[in-house]
Amino acid sequence: MYVNQIDDIIDGILNKLYFEGLSNDESFNSIVNSNKINFVEYREQINKFIDDFVKSIDLTEIRKIINNKDNLNRIIDIIKRYVAYYYFLSIAYNYTGSLKDFRNNMIQYSKLQESSTFIIRNFFDTENNYQLIKYFKIIKDTSKILLMTDLQRKTLNPLDVKDTIDFLNGLGKEYINNYLLMITVVDNEDTVNINPHNLIKTIVFGELYKNQERNLVFEILNEIEEDKEEYTYIDIVVSSDETNDLNNFRQIFLGEDDAEARARDLFELANETNRVTTIETVETKNNDLIALKIITPIVDDFLRYHRDTERLDAESGPVNIPIVSNNNSKNVQLALLYQQRKKKENTRAQLVINKLDAILDYYSPNVKNNPEFISEIKKYFQNPLSYRKAVLHNYLDEVNVIDKIRKQGKKAMENNEYFLELMQIITHAYFNFKDFKNFGTSINLFNTKPVNMLRYSNIEFQNQMSNLEVDVHTGIEGQSVNLVGLAIGPFNDEPVSCTKKSDLLDIRKIQITYMKNDQPVTRSTDNGYKAFLKIIKHFYINTLEIREEPEFSIYNNFDDIRKLNPDIFGKMIYWTYNTELDTFEMDTYENIKSNSVQDIIRFMNAMIYDKIMDFLDKKLVLLIETHTNLSLSKIESLIQIFSNMNQLSIDQEERRDLVISNFLQKKSQETTIVPKKNLEIIPLPEYQPLNLKKPFVIGISMINPLNPQPYIKLEAYSRTTKDRGIIQATHGKCKHESEWNEINKVKNQNLNKYNSLVTAFIEKYHLETTQLDYVCKVCGQILPLKRYVQDGSFNNNTQQFVTAYVPIDIPLEEIKEYRKYVLAIRYIDALINRVSLITNTNMLVGTNTNVRQRRKGLVKNIIDIILKHNSVNMRKNISDVERSEYLAKKYNINKDLNEVYFFELDDSIFNFTPTASNTEITLNKLKFNNILLYFILIFITELNGPQITMMATDKIAGNIYVFLKYGQKLFGDLLIKTNINSNETAPITQYPVLCYLLYLLSYYLVKYKLWYQPGENTKVYNPYYSKVIINSFVDLFNGISSDAGRITDDYVYKLTVSKMYTQLNTTYRNNEIINILRRNQSKYDTRSSGIDTTQVTTENEIPTYPIANPINIPVKPRAIPDFKKSSGIIFDREDKILYPIQLTNTDITNCPIGSYHAWVSDGHDIRCTICGEKGSEVTGSVIRLDANYYYSLNNIANRRCIRGTLHDFIDKNGKLVCSICGHTPNETYDKPDLDKLMDNINKIDDQNAENLLRNIHNQQIKYENQQKVVEDFIREIKTDYAKDSNNKLYGRLGPICDKLITIFETYLGSNVNLDIDKYPVYLRNNIYIIDHSYNGTPLDKPVIFSQNENRILFRENHQFFKTDVYYYTDNRLQIDVFYHAVTLKLLGYKEKHKEYTRVAKTNSYLKINYSIMERLLMLGYKTKYIDIEDNFVRNSSRIKDVNTNYFQIIDNLIKDHINKIKKIIDKFSSTIYKIKNYQNQLNEEQEPIYLQSSQDIDKLISKYFNIIKIFNIGEDDKAFDNWNYLRTNFEYQEINWLDTNVRPSENMYVNSELVNYYDISSSEMMYYLVDQLISIIDSNPEKITRSNLCQMMVEIIMYIYNIYNIDEYKNILEFKRFDYIINGSSVMVDMLRRGQGLEQSKELEQHLDDTEPDIMQDMDGEPQEADELEDLKEEAESLDIEGDYFAEEDEDYAQEDFIE
């Protein structure tokens, strides 16, 4: 007794119902023929028909199976249900109304049925109504889809027809063609239609019955069987192995959450070694076979070839091929194809498609059996390229046809039946035939690498054009090919494309010879399978050998093959399939005879692949075993190279086994050699001490080793052995080499210590040559110091050089000492970049290596001096009050204006978020101001005169004339130290350039709000803060100078003060710079005559006097301390002897030749070693100024020619001679020549000054022109923006984004899933995901709705839930389900005719996958609804007016959004430029980046670089080129909120749409962004490139959106709990730790907030203070979009909230 007996009975009943019942039912025919919408009115007639039909069923066969009355009634009820199903689905098939109409009818029918006497058990209820409505849609969709073309099906929305697609996929193509489609003859033409009976019966019987009642029928039959049969009980044997028993693992986790899942995971882990390895499918093996380098697949296709003169014959119709096949499936598809053709109009598009369809059928059985049609199709191939199987077409005509369709509009394109087919045709050149000429199989390629394929036309027409190279083309992933054979060769390593057609050999017509057991063997066969494997094995695999030179590699040694097969060696052997000749045996039993020819060929290819892999495995083992003399690393390289070369997948375990089993165990062990006795013993060598003899005299140049110079005498000795012929050379090293090696050991440990040691090394050993090289003072060897010297500075006070070396290739934050200051490094780097742009000192702006290195060195110096100076002063035992009093007294610093503060530097200083305490925020602001002071100190030391004169100015206060007018008031009587070794001070006004720099920088810091200004301040520039900065700077300057004088050996102080005082004594006191500034900025002079005198006092210039008339300056004698020699008694008093001061150069100071005396002791007198004069002979009355003057000029003349240029010494006859003037080194010149030299030097100086002024003027003009261009561009953007938005002030962001989305739709499709997320993502429609039922119970499979379905609705201020809600209606259960509109949490539900029900304690949420349009509008926001409750409560303590508080918060939200939009545009531009200029910088030695977001952006960049390697970035590649100039011009525009409709509400959330509406600046920036993106798309003419660019931009939008948005995480319970623990109060955290829920802890905390005042004070203060803090953060964080410190995309500080 079997269940299928009942199945056959039900199947027969349904057939009878269709053929005999419905056709005679008047009610059914009336509903169908009259297109009745309301079929409820036929309810009584339908009930009567079903009842009569069921009663008419013959139950005889059923009673034979079931003799129990109860069971019989149950079976009859089941039959009655499915008769009703069939009846109503038949109505559904013919129903002309909408789905909604059918649903309403079924619901009404079910309600009325409650009072009916006719009963069908379990039918007229909600569940069955849902099934009928579901299958109503499936029937309607099936009727459309099955009659569509493939390309028309691709235009369908997968979400709309998902159920139908699943239904059809479950049936399969063969079933659909054989049963659901049928061919009918209409007007003597074959027409394909839907078979309604089979379709409905498939649903009723196959979907409903088998999934519902069939199990019940089985149980009934099983009960009957059990009553009749007897049973035999058996014992079950259970394994004693605990690891194989899942129940043992279940016991471990008994009582725990997810016990079953955990037990299964542990069970699988324990039994992992017993898992069966995955077996490759036949399809995979076929792909892997043709991907092998040694094999070339042969494909049969035809080529469409363009010819300008080709024209379509409009009169000719399609070739109609009759249906003659015995295969119903093929007949249906063929008839359907012709039917689709006939639907098309007789247009040019139809002619193109009909022609192609006819050619595709060239090898179909219907054509082969009809010679007339063969000749018709052959006409298409009758052209000069017929030997290539090419048909001619006119590409330009086809493009014109497509353009005409496009011009009709988007809707016309979508409704056009052949538009997609045309697009498919013109974008491809090669097309597969639908059938095969002889033998072949179809393969879908899924290899990522392209495959070279040989066309079958080369073989088919080999005798035509045989001297040409073979025709090949490339197959790519996703392509389908008709594989008709395989080819191998040529064997001379030439590419396949270079093989001629005449060199093609049939594998069945050749003999091959190979070596077997050292004997030649010759074979030939008709079995291509066997011959192909023999060639692969003996020609390719057995010839693999190892080559160790010039590099380790594997190659094919074809020498023997070439000798044995001279006729085929350089040729290509092809094998075309023939299943009648190509027989093969399988290792396992497979009945493949019942398979089709295509399946047999696939099995055969899979066998070939297995055999080749087996050959390769054996060959690899043989290579390892025969090369045990190689090293282990070479064997590992061998395995790696072999596997890569032959595409072997060898895992790590298999490699290990290969090495152990076939190498280490086979490797012969070297035997120990034991010497025999009585052999001659060779004595060991004996050490003999060396005699130091034979001195050598060596001449060493102390200045320039390359040129002969007077030398000192050194003696060196060789060491000799007993053998006089063997001399052991000594390798002596200078001490500087060993010291240098020791210094380099510190290089990667402590950079500052390294620099300090290098500085000491330079001082100890270096000597500069005339060629500007650096040599050792001791040995004359060149020292590697140039890169250390070029970054350093010379300290005039200590007469020492101090290096400032910073390694180029290592980021500063990766150096050990600076790893904990990552954020500080980036903020200071951003600050340098920002201030450089503001002040127009562009030597520190840019991305080239030199600029980046210089900026990095500056950052390092700033951090070093901050750390050092703060550390030193924090250890001092002095209070701040005492220190202020001391500074005020000593340096006249106003202690009320001094903000110097000493602190420990750490990254928390830059924490300006509202979560920080008020005290912490205040301290951080003060610390940040102090960092600015250090920045000013280091920054101005990098400026030279020309850079100072070119600094930016403005007409308000930032110019020289305002400085000259008010400078005295700012600087007053402030004093600075003139050196570090004494307490000598000077008024700061003696250094006018320093004062100007301090004034200008303080002005810009205040103007751009980089300097924190507490309190309300509405002025653009407040001079008070300039005075604060200046007084604080003087404190810092003097403090560093004093501490450097005390700690003289500290490298950081030494480097800082050397730069400070070098600038102080040169640039800062240069009045000429002030004069140049006055000339350059004369436009700011408010008086017509200009300002004649400088109000800032300067030190008087030292007057000069001619040599002939010197001035006498009276100077008192000075005391020189002198100490007597003692006989043991210590004298504490010195003898005071007065010595007269020498006021001029006399015979006491200078020799007659003008040089200074070099006095040495000579008995009781002193003697000059240069001129020989004695101290007793000189009187001081002989003036030698003139001699000294010419002596100095003579020294200059030894470096420069008379004309003023440097000498160019060359070797001439053994002497150094200048090639310019002919003079030799150290030559003495006469006075006329020296006077002439001085005149020429003065001329050169004058010329240099003129060039400098000219360059300054040109740069000023360039800067002004650049500013004008920027202003014009901004004006143009604002004008275009206003024009596009019809001069609207607010609410302009939506149309801007819509413009970009429209462009995307053009190239990506309007309603297409972009497939970039786990849930669908569309351009315009949001997606709603529901993964739970109405009461919060999780669903196995989520339900997905699209926005355009209008299933998810929105309602404001719901009357029951008292908030805005989303809701949907579950028609199946008649339940409305409600969600909170802000949090998306499940609130409750309402059943029909019942009260509302709240769902408590649930973690169920509505998920929204926003569209690209919505994400574009939400860029920069954490969430769509912004929670402002905390900010509102905190502000309410000082802002009593509710409206003012609310409006201030919205203002801050807008400001924050403006800053984030700037950073978003930065990210857009930088990402696009990175893709354009992508370079893969990660090598094997570098550590990979583990941060997920960094991996995401790296993958995105790498992905689109590989997809679109070459593309244009706007016109002339200048998209975003001017963004850096525009960036700072977008600022918050004040809004009068009282003039708007915006008012605070009880709901403490602000919709991001409200912020967007009133955010004018962000709208303008988004307009700029969209304009640049569109320009990038338009600058690339190729459509495929535009499509790829659009897809790339979509993914960039997704990436940036995900950086800011937290919607994905905010409703995850674990994240919420973590957030509450981190940010909650102590009471709340304590409750959470004790196991309380989040809701209870929030309620208690809210209660505490209401009863106790909040101790957290607001960080903003007054409204203006918020603006300042906002700008401070913006300026501190803002970076150039190509800055080098933001290489890791995950570190985005824009995510930090900055809102009150």
Curated annotation (Swiss-Prot):
| Topology with respect to the bilayer | Single-pass membrane protein
Looking at the UniProt entry, the stretches that span the membrane are: 986-1006
- Alphabetically ordered keywords of this record: Coiled coil, Host membrane, Membrane, Transmembrane, Transmembrane helix, Virion
Where is it localised? Host membrane; Virion
Q: Where is the composition biased (Acidic residues)?
A: 1651-1700
Q: Give me the ranges of the annotated region Disordered.
A: 1650-1700
Query: Record's Gene Ontology CC terms?
Result: host cell membrane; membrane; virion component
> What is this protein identified as?
Uncharacterized protein R472
Name the major location.
Answer: host cell
Coiled-coil intervals, chain numbering = 1246-1278, 1657-1684
